[in-house]
Amino acid sequence: WTGTWFADIAGKTDRSVTLASGMKYLDTYLYPQESIRTPSICLLFWKGDDRMVGHNRFRRFVMAHHTPKVDGKPAHFPESSSFNYGDPSPCNEYTCLTADYAIALIRRYKQFDIVPEVFWLDAGWYSQAADYKNHKNWANTVGNWTVDREKFPDGLKPVSDEAHKVGAKFMVWFEPERVIKGSQWAEEHPEWMLDAGTDAYLFDLGNPKALEWFCDQIGELIDQNGIDYYRQDFN
């Protein structure tokens, strides 16, 4: 389920368990003939001496009936690798990764002949996300969808070009539907912001004009930076 959901599970006694699950914060209504799909749920009840037998039967059930298949066989998904950047703190991929480091890492993969199918650039590539001294981070700067030119002076295209040079694709993380208050998008188009009661707005994707602008902005970023895969997140 791609939206926010919840599952509250509690053991009341040695012989009973309670479960409440669904879409978190759902407060809506439907017009006649309208319908929506709620999150699906699957419960497995097991009784036996070895709970691992139950675990394994559940896994087999998921593999057999709920795993994407191509020609009757489990689908092969692209092998990917992110641009991991370790300590010392506060350095990590979100704060200290630069174009030079990313390109060097791609070449290192090539040197040892372990190039993945996809190189994945995770969150933090946009403006202000690395400003940890002012308590900024990847999560509280979404809505500033311009490439951080201090870390990537020529945009993301040089990283993409290097990935393509070694035979890989380039994937980039996005979360454009969540817009932090005070961010670039929030300031430019307050009329398209829906207040979610948090530090972030939700972009009004139900507004046709807003949706068109939204797609143009993200599409331009993808085209200009040589992005092959769009990675959608929603926090």
Feature-to-residue mapping (PLM):
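N-terminal accessory beta-strand-rich subdomains and adjacent acidic, glycine-rich linkers
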Residues: W1-A64
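Sequence-level motif detector for i,i+2 pairs with an aromatic at +2
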Residues: D14, P74-F77
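Short, solvent-exposed coil/turn segments
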Residues: M23, K73-P74
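Long, charged amphipathic helices and adjacent flexible linkers at domain junctions
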Residues: V62-K73
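Aromatic-lined carbohydrate-binding/catalytic grooves of carbohydrate-active enzymes
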Residues: H76-Y229, N235
